[in-house]
Regions:
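Active-site-adjacent beta-strand/loop module that shapes the phosphate/pyrophosphate-binding cleft
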Residues: 1-22, 56-57, 126-134
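Short acidic, glycine/Ser/Thr-rich loop/turn "cap" segments at secondary-structure junctions
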Residues: 1, 35-40, 67-69
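Core RNA-modification/binding signature centered on pseudouridine synthases
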Residues: 65-145
């Protein structure tokens, strides 16, 4: 095998959030382009792993600065499990179910609906929705302090 010698290399990385239902475009013309779970990335060249780690930290910073960003990537109605799993993926750690429910229920802008899951083998979960008006009211109260 011969190694390619590279004098200098500049990597430009772009960061964007998109829903996980998004598919790669067939026009990409490459079989190697695919979505990968963050905890199961393929071996990456150069400093690309560090770039991805920095991007993940940046997403965490976005969520801490503006928590509503999470709800842009949730279905219109979602379960507590779906919301908790989203946070677990972002922060790469399991969260205590009871503590998460307490925290979630303390947020005025996460509103329970009358809808319940159907067609599931386990106890049906309640659906919630994000109330942007309540969120903005709460944020404006906080900003006045």
């Amino acid at each position: 095998t011969s190694k390619v010698k590279i004098g200098r290399l500049i990597t430009v990385a772009y960061l964007a959030l998109c829903k996980n239902s998004r598919k790669t475009c067939p026009a990409d013309k490459s079989d190697s382009i695919r979505w990968c779970p963050i905890d199961d990335l393929p071996r990456l060249p150069f400093d690309h792993k560090e770039i991805i780690e920095a991007a993940i930290q940046e997403i965490r910073n976005w969520v801490e600065k503006e928590p509503a960003i999470i709800f842009d990537y949730m279905p219109m109605k979602f379960t507590a499990f779906q919301l908790r799993r989203t946070y677990e993926v972002i922060y790469n750690r399991e969260m205590d179910v009871r503590n998460f429910h307490k925290k979630m229920n303390s947020l005025d802008y996460v509103v329970p609906t009358d809808d319940m899951q159907d067609g599931v083998a386990h106890r049906a979960a309640r659906y919630y929705r994000f109330d942007k008006v309540k969120y903005n009211q709460q944020r404006s109260k906080f900003n006045k302090i």
